[in-house]
Amino acid sequence: MTTIDEVPGMADETALLDWLGTMREKQPVWQDRYGVWHVFRHADVQTVLRDTATFSSDPTRVIEGASPTPGMIHEIDPPEHRALRKVVSSAFTPRTISDLEPRIRDVTRSLLADAGESFDLVDVLAFPLPVTIVAELLGLPPMDHEQFGDWSGALVDIQMDDPTDPALAERIADVLNPLTAYLKARCAERRADPGDDLISRLVLAEVDGRALDDEEAANFSTALLLAGHITTTVLLGNIVRTLDEHPAHWDAAAEDPGRIPAIVEEVLRYRPPFPQMQRTTTKATEVAGVPIPADVMVNTWVLSANRDSDAHDDPDRFDPSRKSGGAAQLSFGHGVHFCLGAPLARLENRVALEEIIARFGRLTVDRDDERLRHFEQIVLGTRHLPVLAGSSPRQSA
């Protein structure tokens, strides 16, 4: 039995949600044995994510011997973050993202074309779809796509018990160094021969009057590549799992595809791919009246915030028709670090679900298939999701 002092693993979702509910009620701000502070309630999580002056995104502040990674946008605070984000923001405007829909649909149909009655959703669609799209945006060749999965898989497999452990920072660097070296080589190529892609835009850009060097551009590209495919890979699996648990929504989506965006949004709240986000304190502060010292790590539980009854009515019920009452689901972050690629992730998952329904009607999770595997840490979702293609809801009515 999990105690209040033990954080359950991501693979046991029931135990994790029970623990988060207990913490929201009994210890909404809590320090673990590693000295990391955890925040569980929606209002408090939102406050931490919004206040970048007090809660920095740079984890190296509290890791002995670590130094900031130039260009790693999700670890950079304003005002540098604002300037760096502006470099690629035009690639993520609503119009630009909307223009990607035909390509996303073509890729999705192509990937599903050879799927049989039984297949692994992650291998067939959830991984290759977002990798293809983000790699094309960056200008990376198809022959390298499989390698990206190896790198991201190695990253989420790193044992991360103590996030302040200097050895952990070294292990992360060991995993990311080959990816960064690969992207650094691509940056050098684009600097010599620029094209119409995000890497070319990065190497030619100026931030505060100076050009980004290849290391900064490569680190920025690393962040875009990893975030650009892990989120959709995990989210699409979570959508199918959730609809499998609530099958009436397969029929509702088939009858009215206009409901699909709300389904995607509700799954984001219900099962966020990244259930927690970390910050570090720049000064002594308080959260919900609890003193927190300077230079410590603060772990905000987005999954818990999204299940907070003070923010969402009946939060443990999956309800795509719910009205938030003004409370935001925080799965893409909040404030200046709100995920740049959120519109792309929403579009990819909407199109993917539309095409799944058009081809199969519905999918059923094959729980007896030994390939079914959940991530143990970092992300909430399935590494492999075996599914069975169902008959069309219109045919089985």
Swiss-Prot record:
The molecular function terms in GO held by this entry are: heme binding; iron ion binding; monooxygenase activity; NADP binding; oxidoreductase activity, acting on paired donors, with incorporation or reduction of molecular oxygen, NAD(P)H as one donor, and incorporation of one atom of oxygen
Q: Name one GO biological process term.
A: macrolide biosynthetic process
Classification via CDD domains: P450_EryK-like
Basic and acidic residues: bias regions: 307-322
Alphabetical UniProt keywords: Antibiotic biosynthesis, Heme, Iron, Metal-binding, Monooxygenase, NADP, Oxidoreductase
Residues noted as binding heme in the record, renumbered to the chain:
H81, R85, R279, H337, C339
Return the EC number.
Answer: 1.14.13.154
Phenotype of the disruptant?
Cells lacking this gene no longer produce erythromycin A but accumulate the B and D forms of the antibiotic.
Q: According to the UniProt record, where is the region Disordered?
A: 307-326
Instruction: Locate the residues binding substrate.
Output: H74, E75, Q278
Q: Which Pfam families match?
A: p450
Which cofactors does the annotated protein need, by name? heme b
Does the keyword section mention Oxidoreductase? yes
EC class (word): oxidoreductase
The pathway noted for it is: Antibiotic biosynthesis; erythromycin biosynthesis
Q: What does this protein's UniProt record list under function?
A: Erythromycin B (ErB) is not a substrate for this enzyme.
Similarity comment text for this entry: Belongs to the cytochrome P450 family.
Quote the protein name from its UniProt record: Erythromycin C-12 hydroxylase
Query: Where does this protein come from, organism-wise?
Result: Saccharopolyspora erythraea (strain ATCC 11635 / DSM 40517 / JCM 4748 / NBRC 13426 / NCIMB 8594 / NRRL 2338)
